[in-house]
Amino acid sequence: MSQTSLKKERDPSILILDFGSQYSELIARRIRETNVFSLVVSNFISIEDINRINPKGIILSGGPNSVYEQNAPRCDEKIFNLGIPILGICYGMQLMVKELGGTVISATKKAEYGRAPLNIDQESDLLFDVEDKSIMWMSHGDSINCLPDGFNKIAHTENTLHAAISNDVKKLFGVQFHPEVVHSEFGMRVIKNFVYKISCCTADWTTETYIEETIPRIREQVGNKKVLLALSGGVDSSTLAFLLNKAIGNQLTCMFIDQGFMRKGEPEFLMNFFDKKFHIKVEYINARERFIAKLKGITDPEQKRKIIGEEFIRVFEEESNRLGPFQYLAQGTLYPDVIESAGTNIDPKTGERIAVKIKSHHNVGGLPKDLQFKLVEPLRKLFKDEVRKVGAALGLPDEIIKRHPFPGPGLAIRILGEVNNEKLDCLRDADWIVRDEIKKAGLYNDIWQAFAVLLPVKTVGVMGDKRTYSWPIVLRCVSSEDGMTADWSKIPFQILERIANRIVNEVISVNRVVYDITSKPPGTIEWE
């Protein structure tokens, strides 16, 4: 069945034009939290495409550029005459002002970063129920000097005269602060006001409606063909397995490829849970030695990811020929996966959008060019928290839904440098201790990820009056809402001490434990 014959996917009620902001996807998440579907699109989107999508509202994101720079990113200026409500955030507001005849100036002497009280100057639908002098998050070096005709100043801060503006006739609004970040006390109120009071959206983006819309789309796309799913036991592939099982039943075959990089006890748990408990067909493939052989001598993390991804598909192809034929490969690709694997940025010389790769994602970056399957990726527009809700609605238990995210390449990218069985055994034991103690302390559900990393160096230690020269283990525990940004977890010292003591006493070849306190950004959650 051709892709063009499929039923039309749901169009977003709110379009977010991305001008390079680190918060663009966060804006999308916040809008979805109001039960309204939103998507991030290029700032170069055409007027024709906007009219085809017919959104209820448009948001112009922030960005790192200055609007008066020669090649500053822009959008089609006709967008402001479509009659669609528009909210410009930070750079987005400045761009709107400039395009409509106002002026923006450098405000290096009064640049504003961090928390600032918002002083409301006049009533506005945008600031309805927002308390005067509430704290909002600022992050800008430029400011509006002169408003275009028809605009009013509706709020200011100590250093920003035009902290919020409006043109009620044309339904054009702007804020210099970032309502999408948690530091803005009434940020969600501002977003809800734009979504509901101004754009008149309907709260119809729910877990139930997603399932209702997705199941018939899967059936239409797949027809009577067979689907193969790589089942890892994580929340993404598990939710996808339940979703596909509900949609197409015995047309689905789940394949668990044990590449040797799983956490302690996971292969046994996975087979018992899906095959025996829920009677979803799972084929177990032991490919441990095959993967280890492929990684021999490989130290570069991108190479490891690519090799694992390609080998994964090769095994899939071989096993599908034996068990199949299968025409479709189902993947648990999520929205942040797509964003991270092919992010976007603006070329400062040409103003053109360019791809910026952060690191390849196992699902979307490691696929070989001669892939023999068609793809089924019904989760690719969802964030992680949305996937968990879908899983819960489909009947997945908490022990799966609340499991910490685990990368596709597994422990292979938590061992820095070359991977071998000795290092895997060492890391597997250390990682199990980390998670065991976190669970005993009742902190597991409060932490986004908690795991161990094995470094490719050795350190000197003393154990039993003898000198040791062994590997160090890094503890990595982070708090996050969606994995796009993260802060290191402030775990009580006594728990960290218990973890460290157990690792150095119970895990052979480890004599030192350190704790990573780097946030994302500037670091990433995984070390590779």
Swiss-Prot record:
Q: Identify the PROSITE patterns for this entry.
A: GATASE_TYPE_1 (PS51273), GMPS_ATP_PPASE (PS51553)
What this protein catalyses is:
XMP + L-glutamine + ATP + H2O = GMP + L-glutamate + AMP + diphosphate + 2 H(+)
Q: What is its EC number?
A: 6.3.5.2
Q: Kindly list the GO CC terms recorded for this protein.
A: cytosol
* UniProt xrefs under InterPro entries: Class_I_gatase-like, GATASE, GMP_synth_C, GMP_synth_GATase, GMP_synthase, GMPS_ATP_PPase_dom, NAD/GMP_synthase, Rossmann-like_a/b/a_fold
A single GO molecular function term of this UniProt record: ATP binding
Group of enzyme by EC: ligase
Task: Tell me the Pfam families matching this sequence.
Answer: GATase, GMP_synt_C, NAD_synthase
List each copy of the Glutamine amidotransferase type-1 domain by range.
13-204
Keywords for this protein: ATP-binding, Glutamine amidotransferase, GMP biosynthesis, Ligase, Nucleotide-binding, Purine biosynthesis
Pathway field of the UniProt record reads: Purine metabolism; GMP biosynthesis; GMP from XMP (L-Gln route): step 1/1
**Active site per UniProt:** 90, 178, 180
* CDD domains (UniProt xref): GATase1_GMP_Synthase, GMP_synthase_C
Q: Where does ATP bind?
A: 232-238
Occurrences of domain GMPS ATP-PPase (ranges): 205-403
**Task performed by this protein:** Catalyzes the synthesis of GMP from XMP.
Quaternary assembly:
Homodimer.
Name of this chain's protein: GMP synthase [glutamine-hydrolyzing]
Which organism's genome codes for this protein?
Answer: Prochlorococcus marinus (strain AS9601)
